[in-house]
Amino acid sequence: MRPWCQLALLACLSLKWLTSHVTAESFLCDDSELCENGYLRFGRSMSVEEPHFRLERRSYPPVVYHKRFLRFGRSQEPDIEDYARAIALIESEEPLYRKRRSADADGQSEKVLHRARREAESEHKSLEEVSPDTKQDVEKRDADDVLDAEKRFMRFGKRFMRFGRGSSDDDESGDDDVQDLTDIGDGLGGEGEVNKRFMRFGKRFMRFGKREDGEPDKRFMRFGKSMADNDLDKRFMRFGKRFMRFGKSLPDSEVDKRFMRFGKSVDGDVDKRFMRFGKSVDGDVDKRFMRFGKSVDGDVDKRFMRFGKSVDGDVDKRFMRFGKSVDGDVDKRFMRFGKSVDDDVDKRFMRFGKSVDGDVDKRFMRFGKSVDDAVDKRFMRFGKSVDSDLDKRFMRFGKSVGSDEVDKRFMRFGKSVGSDEVDKRFMRFGKSLGTDDVNKRFMRFGKSLGTDDVNKRFMRFGKSLGTEDVDKRFMRFGKSLGTDDVDKRFMRFGKSLGTDDVDKRFMRFGKSLGTEDVDKRFMRFGKSLGTDDVDKRFMRFGKSLGTEDVDKRFMRFGKRFMRFGRSVGDSKYRSASSESVMTTDSKQTTEQATNKS
């Protein structure tokens, strides 16, 4: 019996080995050339010697990796581009290594050189003016940019998604053939440093069209043609100056900055109207914007977005009026729906449903029905209540357990365990361990380690290091440095400087100035003025006025936010006075409605 058991065990092991071998062979590509191209890799590239996936658990050999992410372009197969790149690297690395003294000094000086280059570029100065000591070293280290530039394409932290082709300005240098094979882009003045743009966060990006001069080539999403002036060629869908131009201009090119112009004017001087509709009664007040309907008196013809008709000509300054009134004095209603029971409370706004008592008819956005008339002032109520006194719930979903004090839940999902104090959960997902104190989870994903105190995770992704205190990660991406305290990263992209405290970056794009404290930028666009404190801009568009305090604008369109056009002479004062009059009337109307409510 014993030899038979050993033979059966040997047969099972043989079958297991054969099955594993067949399964491993099924994952390999049939085309060997396709496997050698280095595709199907994430995070870092495979080596040429081992181009396939490794199923066994072991680390990669210490070979040179490019760490490209979502790489598009050349493969591992050598071609003429590789030979040209090798020639460029040999010519650039020989003087570079003669100047190097030690590995430590090289790493420190490289940060200083990169910082000096960025400061000179942002301040539009020469490198010798910013840092005279590092000018010669930067010229010797231009080969590093060529080497690092080859690792871009959809890479968080440096340049990526580069498209386009070089212009005629780049063809004046002697090594054009080598440079065109390694760098594809459009440079300004032959500078190889700015040759890496196009879809690049941190400098110029999304460039379309052609330029007339090398200086104003920083156009973004340019459409149409200019008025034969190179300085005016920066408009068309450009954040910071003119954009979205419609209509035709006057013979003077100075008034060509109109945006979204419609209709016709009465006087040629006031032809800068934007989004004008309807007709005016007096030529002086023809600067209305978005005017609808007609007026009763010519003095109040400055109405904007007027609907319906009025009872008295004095109160004809209504905006967005719907329905009809009961008394002429309360005709200043805005967005009125439904009907009222009492004339005094006819200033309701956005009323739905019906009331039980005329005194509580001032409800706004009421849904459902009430049990008691005194609590009929509910807003956006859903479902039914248990007690009339608790009927003031807002946006209630689900049902309660039966206790009166826990019936004030808002946006409740799921079911409770049975205790009244835990029934106040909001937006609960998943299941609990069966204890009452951990049933208050909100938007929980993933699984816990089995202990009750770590079951309160919210939106957890990834895996923990095995300790209970780090299992509370929220929306974690990427990998940690191996320490427990830095494993709580949220939405981390790119790479860190090597220190634990800067590894907690969130959605970082672009590049830093070389200091660790400015490496925590979030969604940075555009370029800074060269100072460290203004490098933390978020979603910046356009350019500043030259002062550092205005360079921290967020979602800036022009100087003001959503600015269309500019005033001419004293027209802005007349517009401002008319707007102030309308604002005062609107405020008085709102205050009257609020007091009566």
UniProtKB/Swiss-Prot annotation:
Alphabetized UniProt keyword annotations: Amidation, Cleavage on pair of basic residues, Neuropeptide, Repeat, Secreted
Location of Phenylalanine amide modifications: 72, 156, 163, 201, 208, 223, 239, 246, 262, 277, 292, 307, 322, 337, 352, 367, 382, 397, 413, 429, 445, 461, 477, 493, 509, 525, 541, 557, 564
Superkingdom of origin organism: Eukaryota
Polar residues bias locations: 574-597
Keyword Repeat (UniProt): yes
GO BP terms: neuropeptide signaling pathway
Chief localisation class: secreted
Localization of this protein: Secreted
Propeptide: 1-68, 75-150, 166-195, 212-217, 226-233, 249-257, 265-271, 280-286, 295-301, 310-316, 325-331, 340-346, 355-361, 370-376, 385-391, 400-407, 416-423, 432-439, 448-455, 464-471, 480-487, 496-503, 512-519, 528-535, 544-551, 567-597
Pfam family, one: FARP
Listed Basic and acidic residues bias regions: 102-141
GO cellular component, as recorded: extracellular region
Cited InterPro entries: FMRFamid-related_peptide-like, FMRFamide-related_np
Region (Disordered): 98-141, 569-597
Coiled-coil intervals, chain numbering: none
Family: Belongs to the FARP (FMRFamide related peptide) family.
Alphabetical list of PANTHER family matching this protein: FMRFAMIDE-RELATED PEPTIDES
Function in brief: FMRFamide induces contractions in visceral and somatic musculature as well as in the heart.
Protein name listed in UniProt: FMRF-amide neuropeptides
Source organism of the structure: Aplysia californica (California sea hare)
Lineage: Eukaryota, Metazoa, Spiralia, Lophotrochozoa, Mollusca
